[in-house]
UniProtKB/Swiss-Prot annotation:
Record HAMAP family: Ribosomal_uS11 (MF_01310)
Keyword field: Ribonucleoprotein, Ribosomal protein, RNA-binding, rRNA-binding
GO molecular function, one term: structural constituent of ribosome
GO biological process: one example: translation
Protein role: Located on the platform of the 30S subunit, it bridges several disparate RNA helices of the 16S rRNA. Forms part of the Shine-Dalgarno cleft in the 70S ribosome.
Name of this chain's protein: Small ribosomal subunit protein uS11
InterPro entries to which the protein is assigned, alphabetical: Ribosomal_uS11, Ribosomal_uS11_bac-type, Ribosomal_uS11_CS, Ribosomal_uS11_sf
Keyword Protein transport: no
Pfam families cross-referenced by the UniProt entry: Ribosomal_S11
GO cellular-component term (any): ribonucleoprotein complex
Name of the gene: rpsK
């Protein structure tokens, strides 16, 4: 069945689909946390970030902002029928563990947690040290 444009905006409404298991990618930097939940094929089901959850500036880097973003993404994924997820965590940010706990607390069963942070084999030169 083709998707029909909605009346008011003219955009295409997202179709509700039943996806029982998927993958949650948590990208946690020092400034923000982005949670993307996809099916096993890689099609994005839902996503949320600390910024899209209403936090601004330095507050986006906090663990509480990561928790709020993860809960928001998980709620939308559960509405699509998701039950089990594998979690891929990337980055050095403060919201890594908090986001995982929030996904579990929202009612998703976590089957695997993997750290996929890219580590260079002495690649690019890092930025200079800050002197404050």
């Amino acid at each position: 069945m083709p998707q029909q444009p909605t009346k008011r905006t003219g955009g295409v409404r997202k179709q509700k689909r039943n996806v029982p298991n998927g993958v949650a990618h948590i990208q946690s930097t020092f400034n923000n946390t982005i949670v993307t939940i996809s099916d096993v094929a890689g099609e994005v089901i839902s996503w949320a970030s600390a910024g899209s959850s209403g936090f601004k500036g330095a507050k986006k880097g906090t663990p509480f902002a990561a928790q709020t973003a993860a809960e928001s993404a998980a709620r939308r994924a559960i509405d699509q029928g998701m039950r089990q997820i594998e979690v891929m965590v990337s980055g050095p940010g403060a919201g890594r563990e908090t986001a995982i706990r929030a996904l579990q607390g929202a009612g998703l069963e976590i089957t695997l947690i993997r750290d996929v942070t890219p580590i260079p084999h002495n690649g690019c030169r890092p930025p200079k040290r800050r002197r404050v």
